[in-house]
Amino acid sequence: MMEGTYYKEWSAVLDREMEFKVYGHGGVPVLALPARGGRFYDWENNGMPDAAARLLHEGKIQLFCADSIDGESLLAGNESPRRRAEMQEKYFVYLTSELAARIAELNAPERKEKPLIWCVGVDTGAYQAVQCRLRRPRTFAGAMGLSGLYDMGRFLGSAEAVSYTHLRAHETLSDL
């Protein structure tokens, strides 16, 4: 089994600790996002680092397995659609600002310019991965969405409500 380095660090955006695990020592940084309700360790439990062991050992890629907050956003059925969308947007800001900066530090601390990150996700993680690439193309070089769920209406309500709420959440969080 491929060994990784575990991190548990504070997120100012989410106002809580977030966990992630890193495999490899350099190369193209790849941010891996879990499936619906999943955790950072799901990638390891399902054999992803072992499947990519050669690329990781040769320093061609470095894998960063992030945690999700689906239980507080998409899957938080007891919360209003607005609150779930706001949490979803906070998670996006965490991924694209805080975690992306940390990935750059860990991936190539000696480089002056930040490396472009690839993002991969499964299920709702696929949606997150594609969002990272489409909304932050200067940070993310590409995205792979595996078995993606892209209709957030099933979690957040009607398309109009989701769009409006998402845009309002984005306006609120743009100052972070």
Residue ranges, per PLM feature:
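Short, surface-exposed "cap/lid" segments of acyl-processing enzymes
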Residues: 24-55
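Single conserved hydrophobic/aromatic residue that forms the stacking wall/gate
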Residues: 166-176
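Alpha/beta-hydrolase active-site loop
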Residues: 85-105
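A domain-start/cap signature at the N-terminus of enzymes
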Residues: 1-28
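Primarily recognizes the serine-hydrolase "nucleophile elbow" in alpha/beta-hydrolase
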Residues: 114-159
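Alpha/beta-hydrolase active-site loop signature
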Residues: 37, 70, 150
